[in-house]
Amino acid sequence: MTIQGLIPATLTPFNSAGAIDHLALSKHITSVGAATGLYGIAVNGHAGEILALNDDERQAVIATARSAMPPGLKLIAGIEASSIDGLVRQGLRARDAGADMLLVIPPFDVRVYRHLSHNVEAVFHVFQRLDKEVALPMIVFQYPEPSGCAYSLDALERIAALDHVVAIKASSGTPAKYAELHDRLANKLALLPAADSPSLLGMLLHGAPGSLIGISVIGTQQWSDLVFEATRGNAQRAKEIHNNFAVPLMRSIFEYHMHWTATCPFGATKEALVQMGEFSSSWVRPPSVLVSDDKKIEIRKGLLQAGLLKE
């Protein structure tokens, strides 16, 4: 299975009552999907606030996205649970709602389970059940080491042998950690850099086939161009797009993943789309923190520097 190109991780818009705005979601999927050079579109990831959605809402998001998907693109649905049975149920519901692929959020991101992410058999058991019982292509979400639940290389190599494990969302943190993954696993599955920070460029230039990132819903075509140039070795052109377009957004919206403020980065992403006229609200569900007035000003500056707004 060849995976090549950008996969934007989309947002979940809410209305004034805090319910999912399915009309706005449909428009969001259509808008993002209009860019060229995409492999697919992801829903129900962290950017889509999966942790704030109940099971029925998660399935409804997938169904809405399915109906709005442009032809030729894969619909990738995030699944999340802290039990294997829960993950399987999520996977089956995602499949029933029309997902083509799954993004498997680590079930080990719970204090008492984190050490198990290094245990080959524990990790294999999770993905073996998904492989057999859901039987959809899977993207494994690899967290950075400081999370405490990054999968060991041995565990990743073991699950790469499963028929339906086709890619890793490599939220590795640094180009060096991405290179370590690449050296061990690039001949077995697709390694998709996932960084809404300047470390992305180095990962893309290290033989990546594509990328899966949330920030790319802002000016999706430019992000797709960045991925295209970098993955084809056009380093100078990729650097120009990265420095002139991507970095101002990485700084103002995702704060280089340094968390300088308590602002939810996905709320900040929504606010950018509000300022661009694509969203009507930047509201996020608690406990996420809403975008402050000062942050809105900072986001506007980033959009201006990236050329997405004019004075």
Task: Give residue ranges: language-model regions.
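Catalytic alpha/beta core domains of metabolic enzymes, predominantly
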Residues: K132-E133, P144-F254
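C-terminal alpha-helical cap/extension of soluble enzyme domains
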Residues: T2, I7-T10, S31-L38, L205, ...
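Active-site beta->alpha loop and helix N-cap motifs at the rims of alpha/beta catalytic domains
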Residues: T2-A150, L309
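Active-site glycine- and acidic-residue-rich loops that bind
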Residues: A81-D85, S172-G173, M250-R251, H259
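Alpha-helical structural signal in soluble globular domains
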Residues: A35, A60, T64-A68, R93, ...
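A general structural signal for well-ordered alpha-helical segments in protein cores
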Residues: I62, L87, F127, Y178, ...
